[in-house]
């Protein structure tokens, strides 16, 4: 579906969204503003919510794009709902969406290798719902991960671009 949408939409920028997640009202505007810096593709940060949609925390440990996940400095990730891609780029890279669980990881690995000019909005505008599928991590994953990242970056998270520390 994600690969096909590149050919079905009539827009300059394509945002993606899984059926169990949602976006903040300022998501698209923050994406568009970040694209004005000349990027091929952009990503936002995400909030973590329980299965009923209640806020748990900001994700400062997994879906960080330029920065590795907390448990392995060799693994990088961006959640599907955080991606926004210029349509012309999406058409050329769309084949990288495989359609199975983990497709966002496979897609991210492909796009970051082929299109190295990308940026982060620095805003938590995507909302990820825990327990959306059987492979979903639990809230303890984020509690542990955020605590470790707070120790790793005591002077502020670099993905925020403002060198500020978010309390977890």
Residue ranges and their predicted role:
Residues 1-168:
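Nucleotide-sugar donor-binding/catalytic module of glycosyltransferases
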């Amino acid at each position: 579906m994600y690969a096909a949408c590149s050919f079905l939409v009539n827009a300059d920028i394509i945002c993606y969204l899984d059926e169990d997640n949602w976006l903040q009202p300022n998501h698209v505007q923050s994406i568009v503003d970040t694209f004005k810096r000349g990027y091929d593709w952009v990503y936002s940060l995400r909030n973590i919510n329980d299965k009923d949609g209640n806020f748990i925390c900001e994700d400062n440990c997994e879906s960080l794009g330029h920065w590795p996940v907390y448990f392995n400095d060799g693994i990088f990730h961006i959640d599907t709902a955080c991606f926004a891609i210029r349509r012309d780029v999406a058409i050329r890279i769309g084949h990288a969406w495989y359609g199975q669980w983990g497709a966002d990881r496979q897609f991210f690995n492909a796009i970051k290798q082929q299109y190295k000019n990308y940026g982060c909005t620095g805003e938590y505008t995507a909302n990820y719902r825990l327990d959306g599928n059987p492979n979903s991590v639990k809230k303890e994953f984020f509690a542990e991960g955020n605590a470790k990242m707070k120790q790793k970056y005591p002077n502020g998270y670099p993905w925020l671009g403002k060198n500020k520390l978010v309390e977890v």
